[in-house]
């Protein structure tokens, strides 16, 4: 699991920009990042799984069972690799089609977001200004109290705390007022954005493109299933030695335990 977490962390920390820096490629799209994340995660799970199998076989229970899981793990890993290679082109086609068919929706939503952002920006700027003014006023009121603390030290600490409490409460109340005012001004735009999103989704639902894409997706899933059958059969065949070895060993242990009980 540490390997998986490390792989996920590296992917998120580096992202597409690290790949672009080293390989000088064009920056990745969000779809590419999703696919890369899936690949890295699967590889990390495979590597960490082999590590856990190795740890289990070297344990006392693993030595007693003697399942020889590690011998079959590499074969299983190569089978999974072949499965990924066979299904890769079909999956790539699915992502490409989905990205193309929803391009207009992303474009319209970005346009709506930019429009709303332009309308609410003055309110955000006003809120930031008010915030800075309140902080500056608080600091101004704090300066004489700080000097008083330095001069009076410990004996005036309690008195200083009593003076600071109403100042902090006053700042909190004033900022709460500004936040409420900003929320009131932003509510219509939030409702407007929600309505526009619902409208865009309704357009997507009623568009003939979606119905056509639904048919394409069904065909894609059917083709995916046909291509997956041989690879999944190989995967099943690769797992059979593991299951048979496990079953044989367990039956042997049960039989041995039964003989010991009967002998008693």
Swiss-Prot record:
Q: In which tissues is it expressed?
A: Major protein of plasma HDL, also found in chylomicrons.
GO cellular-component term (any): chylomicron
Q: Does the keyword Signal apply?
A: yes
> Which InterPro entries does its entry note?
ApoA_E, Apolipoprotein_A1/A4/E
Domain of life here? Eukaryota
MF terms from GO for this chain are: amyloid-beta binding; apolipoprotein A-I receptor binding; chemorepellent activity; cholesterol binding; cholesterol transfer activity; enzyme binding; heat shock protein binding; high-density lipoprotein particle binding
- Please report a single Pfam family linked to this protein: Apolipoprotein
Could you state what the record's PTM comment says about this protein? Glycosylated. Palmitoylated.
Q: Which residues form a coiled coil?
A: none
Subcellular localization, as worded in the UniProt entry: Secreted
- Methionine sulfoxide is found on 109, 193, 240
Which Gene3D superfamilies would you find in this protein's record?
1.20.5.20, 6.10.140.380, Apolipoprotein (1.20.120.20)
Is this entry keyworded Ligase?
no
| Signal peptide extent | 1-18
Q: Which UniProt keywords apply?
A: Cholesterol metabolism, Glycoprotein, HDL, Lipid metabolism, Lipid transport, Lipoprotein, Oxidation, Palmitate, Phosphoprotein, Repeat, Secreted, Signal, Steroid metabolism, Sterol metabolism, Transport
The subunit field of the Swiss-Prot or TrEMBL record says: Homodimer. Interacts with APOA1BP and CLU. Component of a sperm activating protein complex (SPAP), consisting of APOA1, an immunoglobulin heavy chain, an immunoglobulin light chain and albumin. Interacts with NDRG1. Interacts with SCGB3A2. Interacts with NAXE and YJEFN3.
Task of the protein: Participates in the reverse transport of cholesterol from tissues to the liver for excretion by promoting cholesterol efflux from tissues and by acting as a cofactor for the lecithin cholesterol acyltransferase (LCAT). As part of the SPAP complex, activates spermatozoa motility.
Recorded hits in PANTHER family, A to Z, give: APOLIPOPROTEIN, APOLIPOPROTEIN A-I
Describe the family membership recorded for this protein in Swiss-Prot or TrEMBL: Belongs to the apolipoprotein A1/A4/E family.
Protein's name according to its UniProt entry: Apolipoprotein A-I
Specify the species.
Mesocricetus auratus (Golden hamster)
